[in-house]
Amino acid sequence: MRTDLEKNKHYYAVIFTSNLSNDTTDYSTTSEKMEELAKQQPGFLGVESARDHLGLGITISYWESLEAIENWKTNALHIEAKKRGREQWYENFHLRICLVEKEFKFHKGTL
């Protein structure tokens, strides 16, 4: 994740939880392209993502503002990818947008 989060007192997290369908043709390639595109968007702060062997995935992207999230939501290439996700890649998904007011970190070996 990018360290831009440390510079922002408050920021937003978009939590996207999904279960993949059996047809994941082009999913990985498109997912990588969307991450690269998101990184270029004004207000993007970082992303973390994980998926298990059964297809359950959680991606959390971090943004400076609700306006930045809305701009990403309405990006033409992102809209195309979301459409394909609904039609082909996902059995289901759940999206949450949260305001992050505090964050705490731990690194082994540091005080």
Mark where each language-model region is.
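Short loop-to-helix capping motifs
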Residues: 64-66
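Short S/T/G/P-rich N-terminal loop/turn motif that feeds into the first structured element of a domain
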Residues: 1-57, 68-73, 90-111
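Short, conserved catalytic or adaptor-binding loops enriched in Gly and charged residues
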Residues: 85-88
